[in-house]
């Protein structure tokens, strides 16, 4: 499986070719950030030299046209924002999940990826795991659901691992210590030993 992130600013600068888009099985648009109570804040791309899409909906529409005829999934990506406060509150977790589902339904999207960086202690891992479980509960099995983890932050609960369709592992940086192939392989082995099934693991490359 080839899963790729699409950010509007890079796309508008011509850094993502149509060939690359069409070669991907899964395209994730990092366009939404959670507020602490669960509402969504959308990030619109900036035009480059007066050209390019300037709304997240327009960006998705543009890419959808370029991958027409392929089996590529078109998904929403959630990141940053007040995610730690949101996942720590049961009502906010539910509101967030329901809001995501509404966006997926309205825009005919194939699913959601959570890229929340980073849980730093046991409580934050527990809260994040509960948010993952709530998202699956609200979405059901209709939508493709993944999370993005990192070798320094991957210890979500076993139930959360079971709840997602796959997990992408950012085992390529940003620290240069992760650049050697030996470190790349050992990071992958580490999360496998933790309990992430190999059939659910998508190892990242820069």
Feature map (PLM): residue ranges:
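Glycan-recognition patch characteristic of GH18 chitinases/ENGases
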Residues: 1-102, 179-182
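Substrate-binding surface in catalytic domains of secreted glycosidases
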Residues: 3-7, 36-54, 115-206
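Extracellular/periplasmic catalytic domains that process cell-envelope and extracellular macromolecules
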Residues: 19-23, 66-70, 75, 105-107, ...
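Solvent-exposed, polar/charged alpha-helical surfaces in well-ordered, non-transmembrane soluble domains
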Residues: 22, 61, 65, 94, ...
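Short acidic catalytic loops
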Residues: 27-31, 103-119, 170
């Amino acid at each position: 499986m080839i899963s790729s992130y699409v950010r509007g600013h890079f796309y508008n600068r011509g850094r993502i070719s149509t060939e690359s888009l069409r070669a991907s099985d899964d395209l994730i648009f990092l366009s939404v950030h959670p507020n602490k109570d669960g509402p969504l804040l959308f990030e619109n791309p900036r035009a480059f030299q007066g050209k390019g899409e300037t709304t997240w909906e327009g960006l998705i529409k543009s890419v959808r046209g370029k991958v027409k005829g392929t089996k590529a999934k078109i998904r929403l990506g959630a990141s940053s924002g007040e995610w730690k406060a949101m996942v720590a509150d049961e009502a906010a977790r539910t509101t967030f999940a329901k809001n995501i589902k509404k966006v997926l339904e309205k825009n005919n999207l194939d699913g959601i990826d959570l890229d929340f960086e980073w849980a730093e202690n046991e409580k934050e891992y527990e809260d994040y795991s509960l948010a993952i479980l709530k998202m699956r509960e609200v979405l059901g099995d209709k939508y493709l659901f993944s999370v993005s983890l990192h070798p320094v932050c991957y210890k979500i609960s076993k139930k959360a691992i079971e709840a997602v369709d796959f997990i992408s592992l950012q085992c390529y940086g940003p620290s240069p210590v992760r650049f050697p192939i030996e470190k790349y392989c050992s990071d992958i082995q580490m999360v496998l030993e933790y309990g992430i099934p190999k059939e659910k693991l998508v190892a990242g490359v820069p």
